[in-house]
Amino acid sequence: MYDESIILARGKSMNKAVKWLVVVGCAVMLCGCGNSENRKEQQQSLRTQGIAQAQSGDYDSAVQSFDQALKLSDMQVGSLELDIAAYKAAAEYHQGNLDQAIDTCSAILDVKKSAEIYLTRGLLYRDAENQEAANADFTEALNRTSKKDLIMKGRLYYYMKDYTNAKSCLEEAVKNGDQEGVYWQAELYWDSGNQDYAVSLYQNYLSGESPSHQDAYERVASYQISQEKYDDALATLEQGIAMGDQGSLRSLLSSEIAVYERKSDFPTAKAKMESYLESYPDDADAAREYEFLKSR
C-alpha cells in the first residue's frame, strides 16, 4: 500500500507524506474493461510507469498513466485501484492541482469507503489549511482502522495533534517489535520541537533492518548541518542517496551540494550540481546556483 508521504513529498505541511500523493480516479474512469489477469498486469505496468514518471517530475504524464490504469478496473475498486488512485492524487497535488486531488479522493470515497483514502484526503485538506475538514477525515479513517493497527492509529492521532494517544499507540507498537513505530515517534517529536530526541529516534530507525522512509536521512542530515557537523551530514546524505529515488532523492542531492558549499569545496559542489541538473534540468534555482559555482 502507498505511503502518503509520497503525496506530500515532504512539502512539509503535507509533506508526507505527500515523499509523493495518491488517490483513486474519478468514478467515471472506473469503467469499461474486464478484470482479467492480463488487464491486472496492464494496470500494474501502468502503475509502475506512472510512478517512474512522477519520480522524474513529469506529473502530467503520470496522471495520464494512472488514468489509463484506472480505466481498466471494470467498475471494481479493490486495493490495487485504491493504490493507483492515491498515486494519481499525489501527482495532481504535485501539479499544483490541490482541489483536483481532493476531488479525486472524494470520487473514490463515493464508490468505496477507505481508511487510506480518508487519510489521504485529510492530509490534502490540511495542506489547504482546512483543519476542520482534515480532522473529520482523520476521524473517519480512525473509525475504519483495526484496533490492532497501532501504527495507523498512532499516525492518525498524530495528524489530529492528539499527541497523548499518538504516543501511546506508537510506544505499544514499538514494544511489539514494529520498527515502523520508531519512525513515527521521531516524526512526532520532531514536529513537537524536540529535535534532539527526534534525531536519536531517526538514527535508531535507520540502524534497523531495511528502513523505507528515505526522508529520515534528510531529517538527520539537516540536524547535523545545523550543528555544523558537515562530514557527518555528508555520510548521512550518501546513505540516503544510495536508496535511489524513494521520494526524497532530489532534496538529498540538493542538500549534499549545499554541504560541499559550506565546506568551501566548490569544485565538488560544481560537479555535483552538474550531475543534479542532468536529472532535474527544470530547476531554475539550481541553474542560478550553478552559475555562481562556475565563478568560484
PLM features: residue spans?
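C-terminal motif of bacterial Sec signal peptides marking the signal peptidase cleavage site
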Residues: 29-32
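Alpha-helical segment of the N-proximal tetratricopeptide repeat
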Residues: 42-72, 83, 87-94, 123, ...
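Canonical tetratricopeptide repeat
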Residues: 48, 80-83, 87, 120, ...
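Register position in tetratricopeptide repeats
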Residues: 55, 90, 94, 127-128, ...
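Short helix-capping/linker turns of helical repeat alpha-solenoids
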Residues: 80, 113, 145-146, 177-178, ...
